[in-house]
């Protein structure tokens, strides 16, 4: 859940004027194999050097030092090797055991649309997240009664089954928007299957990781139900690459 938590906190806490650092561990802290203490120390070192902004810190077993991630670009860990990655192509930034940072962090003054001050968020509405796989039976999908939108992930190439039209029609009957994620804005040719869905009313989410798209849509349906698509187009905290 680190990637989803990071995305939500990055979107919500980027304007509080303090550094916020999120982390986790691969094992419980008292396990000798755990990276908990390494991650925690790296978080403290980063806080001492950062004026504000939200970051995620985690040491992968494949890295020498803890890595500093942009929280809204963190991808879910590889389930076999437990390795976290970023969905951008920027050079990785690390923080060593002495607190020295190698690489450049994204400046917090990078142009983005700030979230309004949030004292309380009531997540009364949910978002149905659909991860496709070959032979997925769309008729078996139940849209929750409290759903405010549906987010359908596309395959890596931006394709999706034509059977998703059935789900899109059910969304239309319920008055719910259906968004397509994992689409690239610089792709001059959208595959026919995705194009069919878009021409029938699906809304594209360009250049955004799945986790951030989900967290952002969850905020949109609960905070801005009258302008969900407009909110999804805003770049709140570096989530649009």
Name each model-derived stretch:
Residues 1-138, 145-241:
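Active-site histidine-anchored catalytic micro-motif
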């Amino acid at each position: 859940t680190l990637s989803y938590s990071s995305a939500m906190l990055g979107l919500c806490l980027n304007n509080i004027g303090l550094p916020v650092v999120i982390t986790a561990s691969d094992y419980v802290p008292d396990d000798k194999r755990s990276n908990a203490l390494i991650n925690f120390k790296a978080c403290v070192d980063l806080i001492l050097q950062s004026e504000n902004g939200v970051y995620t810190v985690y040491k992968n077993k494949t890295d020498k030092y803890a890595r500093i991630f942009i929280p809204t670009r963190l991808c879910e860990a590889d389930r076999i090797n437990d390795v976290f990655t970023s969905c951008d192509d920027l050079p990785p930034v690390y923080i060593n055991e002495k607190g020295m940072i190698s690489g450049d962090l994204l400046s917090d003054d990078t142009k983005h649309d700030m979230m309004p001050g949030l004292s309380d968020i009531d997540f009364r509405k949910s978002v149905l997240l659909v991860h496709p796989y070959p032979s997925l039976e769309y008729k078996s999908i139940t849209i929750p009664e409290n759903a405010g939108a549906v987010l359908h992930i596309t395959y890596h190439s931006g394709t999706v089954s034509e059977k998703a039209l059935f789900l899109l029609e059910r969304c239309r009957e319920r008055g719910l928007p259906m968004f397509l994620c994992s689409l690239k804005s610089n792709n001059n040719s959208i595959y026919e299957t995705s194009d069919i869905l878009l021409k029938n009313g699906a809304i594209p989410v360009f250049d955004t990781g799945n986790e951030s798209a989900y967290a952002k849509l969850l905020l949109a349906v609960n905070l801005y139900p009258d302008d969900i698509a407009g909110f999804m187009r805003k770049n709140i905290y570096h989530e649009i690459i």
